[in-house]
Structure formats: structure tokens, C-alpha cells
Amino acid sequence: MLGAAWNAAMQRLGRPLNGSLGVMAASTDMGNVTQRVPGLHPFVGITGAGGALHTREFATHAGSEQGYRLMDDAAIAMAWVIREVATTAESRAAILDRAAQLAQAMGGPTGERA
């Protein structure tokens, strides 16, 4: 739900959604966080950055004017998602209901196994 709102916001900003829109394999602590609360950890592709993350090539592209414009748009999109959830009772209820369903599936209200 949050991901769909993010995708819509990026499209409104004219950012195409190329590549995978599904689950990406990465190593972050967001998986731990989202077992307890709803969360959003979007990824953006930096045009021209063909190298792997955390390399000099990637840093060069990320630090370019184009990279900064992308991060500005990503921040705006994130703000739009937060605003939508904060000001729209229906969106907020749907997200919290889904989070409760997932927590229950994990074994309890906080995701802890009994």
C-alpha cells in the first residue's frame, strides 16, 4: 500500500518506474522494523550508474546534479506519501489494518512468536 502510493508519487513527478516493482534483495534493518510498524524503504535508480552500490562510480553518479535532482524528487514523493497517510483516514486505516494482519500472521500483535 505504501509502495503503491510511492510509485504513484514518483510517476506524478515524471519519474518512470523502470525495472523491478517487486521485492528486491538487499541487506537493511527495515525488515526488522516493518515486523513491528508499517514502513517504506523505496529504491531509486540513478541513471548512468551501471556499477554496484558503494563504489566510486556509484558515488560519482549519486553526487552529480542529476543524482541530486533524483534525490529531491524522491524526498518530495516520500513527503507526499506521508501526507496522504497522515491526512486520509481511509489510507491510514487500510495500512494499519494490513500491518495488524501481518503481525498476527507472524505470531502476535508485535510479530513476536509465542
Where are these regions (language model features)?
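Active-site-adjacent substrate-binding region
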Residues: M1-G48
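His/Asp/Glu-rich mid-to-C-terminal helical/loop segments that flank catalytic regions of hydrolases
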Residues: G48-Q104
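A domain-level signal for the structural core that forms small-molecule/cofactor-binding pockets
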Residues: Q101-P109, A114
